[in-house]
Structures are given as C-alpha cells and as structure tokens.
C-alpha cells in the first residue's frame, strides 16, 4: 500500500491531470473582459451575432469577470472571434419531390483572447461545428430552420470556447 500511493501520485502528475480551474488561460488579474461582435467572412445573416451573444452568455454564466459587449481600452482582456465560413449542404432527398428534406450546416470559427498589453492569452483557429436540420415542403407553414441550427451551433461553440479557456482540456 505504501508503494501504491507514490506510484499513483507520480502517474497522475505525469499525465497532465489538474484540478478544475487550475489550468485557466484567463489570469486572475482579468476582471473585465471585452467581447466585441465577432467578425465574419461568411455570407450569412446574423451568424456572428448569434455566436457573440452565446459566448457572452456562457462567459457570464461561468466566470466572475465583468463582460463588456464592445471593444474597450478599459478592459483587462479582449476576446475577438471570427466566423471563417458557413456552408449548408443537402443531406437527404425526398424521392417523391426530388427536393432536399434535410441539410447539414457547417460553421468554422476562430477566437483570440489578448491581454490589455497585447499578450496572447488564448488562441484557437480551428473550431468546426456541424448541425443537421429538417426543411419543410409546406410553403404556407415554412419556417426557416437554419436560424435555429445556427443558434444550436453557437451554443455548442460558446460552451467549448469557454471550457477550453477555463479548463484547457
């Protein structure tokens, strides 16, 4: 038993194990975090707003920092995001009508967290998310489902970004 404890301790410290919150990319000195509206390279309506709002909501929920919704010199750090691409591809077809019945939306984004002095605290250039959604053939009841899919992707993205910034897993 005496031999098992040091071996277990050595194994856990060697594998990168750490307590929750101890590997944060956000220093304790960051009390104010600016999150301006994400930039976009995609030709899509409202995606950057959905991603920005979801990220702000997640930061408000999971951090003690005060979140500013604009680019501010008074912030201790700034999180910039960019929507790199957004594509929608038909996934399944209705054989009777010859039209698509479901689609796959793919959104690629990157984020950069910088301290007030310009030092990079966190960077991820390769967030890729997919979401499937159904379309309707009934034009009288047509509801554009891609907005709902974008909002679901934005929520997943925000959870992943904030988790990665806070926990580095």
List the model feature ranges, each with a label.
Residues 15-64, 71, 88, 117, ...:
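A structural "domain/chain start" motif
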Residues 7-9, 38-40, 49-56, 78-86, ...:
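N-terminal start-of-chain detector that recognizes signal peptides
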